[in-house]
UniProtKB/Swiss-Prot annotation:
Catalytic-site annotation from UniProt: E207, K339
One Pfam family matching this protein: Enolase_C
Gene name as annotated: eno
Name of protein: Enolase
Residues the record lists as binding (2R)-2-phosphoglycerate: Q165, K339, R368, S369, K390
A single cellular component GO annotation: phosphopyruvate hydratase complex
Length: 429
């Protein structure tokens, strides 16, 4: 058996897909194996997320440098973990949590901690001669996810676009992941033509989706419907729609302000707004349809639409088991978005997925808007059989890298691979 004892840990400052600094961590084992991880970063971040440590030195990268986090890995964390077993993930992560000591991991930085946590797992997988999905998921890891493709961007991810942040397609009717990716890519190219034909801009946002200026929020749904039909696919059967309006960004003084429509809505009115959209479009998933602290609104939303639509908590739940446990008991939402850097360790991420599954909820593994060539989430979604991945449009290498990794995994699994399709959802359609 290869020796999985940690020999050395080193970190460095690298760039993410937005040109901002982030942290990369290498973990070296006595066996000679190495694991490397790059930590992602979000644009719209939940107030309850683990804290990403930034330098605040305005003379470097506008204050966004991560040299403190790098130093914390190279000194405090390296000194504590060298000599430990990288294959004992729970112990590694518990040590990292204790070493930081803060609830939000703000002392050493959740970015420093996550980089080490993931690099340890990758190093241990390499030492065992296993791909990461197999190392983490064991012999039962075989489900390829339905991609939730963000093909139209608005909100914080684009300027002069819609109030709502993300409009997505989900190719649920495809027979395999490879075909799902093809369908999504063809619809994406079709959307580009639709926007172009209407005289719109085909600039892309952070996650590869187009960001045209549109007169109303519903206009975004209308042009996606046209793009799906032009590409030759059946909406509501082969392809479903999903949205992430990121409603925390719209919530002020107890109301939801839809500037594109000149309206301010109460929580109850916002729930009815979504019910109306769901009645007229084949919407299967709605993420952050209400604000992160609007618990009463979330309960109302679940009661109104929870049997028909996947109601995903992102800013609302921040991959946090405490918030998730409360949401499960209060019947607020029925699905959780899983972002590694919201909680900061692999163990806590896996705990959140397990808790969701036990409650009959779904879990959607997600990227952040600031990404890199790191493909960990592709392996994670297969390892956990989560069945859904959210990693942007089929454009920009930082997004496509994850899709390409899933193609490789599907090929490697061969006849054992199972594409989740509509089985990824626990709602009646």
């Amino acid at each position: 058996m290869a020796d999985t004892t940690i020999e050395a840990i080193t970190a460095r400052e690298v760039l993410d897909s937005r040109g901002n600094p982030t942290i990369e961590v290498d973990v070296y084992l006595e066996s000679g194996d190495m694991g490397r991880a790059i930590v992602p970063s979000g644009a719209s971040t939940g107030a309850f997320e683990a804290l990403e440590l930034r330098d605040g030195d305005k003379s470097r990268y506008g204050g966004k440098g991560v040299l403190k986090a790098v130093e914390n890995v190279n000194t405090t964390i390296a000194e504590a973990l060298e000599g430990e077993d990288a294959a004992d993930q729970m112990r590694i992560d518990r040590m990292l949590i204790d070493l930081d000591g803060a609830e939000n991991k703000g002392r050493l930085g959740a970015n420093a901690i996550l980089g080490v946590s993931l690099a340890c797992a990758k190093a241990a997988a390499a030492a065992h001669g296993l791909p990461l999905y197999r190392y983490l998921g064991g012999i039962h890891a075989h489900v390829l996810p339905v991609p939730m493709m963000n093909i139209l961007n608005g909100g914080k991810h684009a300027q002069n676009s819609t109030d709502f942040q993300e409009f997505m397609i989900m190719p649920v009717g495809a027979p395999s992941f490879r075909e799902a990716l093809r369908w999504g890519s063809e619809i994406y190219q079709s959307l580009k033509k639709v926007i172009h034909d209407r005289g719109g801009s085909t600039n892309v946002g952070d996650e590869g989706g187009f960001a045209p200026s549109l007169p109303t929020n519903e206009a975004a749904l209308q042009i996606i419907v046209e793009a799906v039909e032009r590409a030759g696919y059946q909406l509501g059967d082969q392809v479903m729609l999903a949205m992430d309006p990121a409603c925390t960004e719209l919530y002020k003084d107890g109301k939801y302000h839809l500037e594109r429509e000149g309206r301010s809505l109460t929580s109850a009115e916002m729930v009815e707004y979504w019910a109306d959209i769901a009645a007229r479009y084949p919407l299967i998933s709605l993420e952050d349809g209400l604000a992160e602290e609007d618990w009463e609104g979330w309960k109302l939303l679940r009661a109104r639409l929870g049997d028909r639509i996947q109601l995903v908590g992102d800013d609302f739940l921040v991959t946090n088991v405490k918030r998730l446990a409360r949401a499960i008991s209060e019947q607020a939402a029925n699905s959780i978005l899983i972002k590694l850097n919201q909680i900061g360790t692999l163990t806590e991420t896996l705990d959140a997925i397990t808790m969701a599954n036990r409650a009959g909820w779904t879990a959607v593994v997600s990227h952040r808007s600031g990404e890199s060539e790191d493909v960990t989430i592709a392996d994670l979604v297969v390892a956990t059989n989560a069945g859904q991945i959210k990693t942007g449009a089929p454009a920009r290498t930082d997004r496509v890298a994850k899709y390409n990794q899933l193609l490789r995994i599907e090929e490697e699994l061969d006849s054992a691979a199972h594409y989740a399709g509509m089985g990824a959802f626990r709602v009646a359609r």
